[in-house]
Design a protein with these regions (language model features):
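Nucleotide-sugar donor-binding catalytic core of glycosyltransferases
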Residues: 1-149
Length: 149
């Protein structure tokens, strides 16, 4: 069965044919990127989703923002919510190679953890270096600070 989808308002360098949602839907559907989609996925990096028509709009955020259910039919977010239109999908979930996506020139997926490596006992490894920077929303000095790190 064919399913037409599209993505708008995602981060720079987002690849519509190489992401969690595309690969997930491709396991059950013949997925096609289309300007008149059945499902429009949108994030919070722009506001062009408001001008797009689609049978269904699905909001995704990895930011500390709650979905506006007046604008979307369904949402994937970090939020614990009792709303049946919201599915909790923390950002870390997208960093696992659930679909065994091969390495490609367009996107280096070598940093992803293959699903098979998550099964069985964990092997301890000595960590050499670690850096963590957590922030919510891209305002103020946060983005320039992140770029300096």
């Amino acid at each position: 069965m064919k399913l037409k989808i599209n993505f708008v308002d995602f981060w720079p360098n987002f690849i519509p044919t190489d992401n969690y949602f595309y690969h997930l839907l491709s396991t059950k559907y013949d997925v096609e990127i289309d300007e008149s989609p059945d499902i429009l996925f949108y994030a919070d990096f722009e506001n062009s989703n408001l001008s797009h028509e689609a049978q269904r709009k699905v909001y995704y955020t990895g930011e500390n923002k709650r979905p506006n259910f007046d604008e979307c039919d369904f949402a994937f977010s970090f939020d614990y919510s009792d709303n049946p239109k919201n599915y909790r999908l923390p950002l870390w979930v997208l960093w696992i190679n659930w679909f065994d996506v091969p390495h490609s020139e367009e996107r280096d997926v070598s940093y992803l953890t293959p699903l098979n490596n998550l099964i069985g006992p964990r092997k301890a490894s000595k960590k050499q270096k670690f850096c963590n920077f957590v922030f919510s929303n891209h305002t103020g000095i946060r983005v320039p600070l992140l770029n300096e790190i």
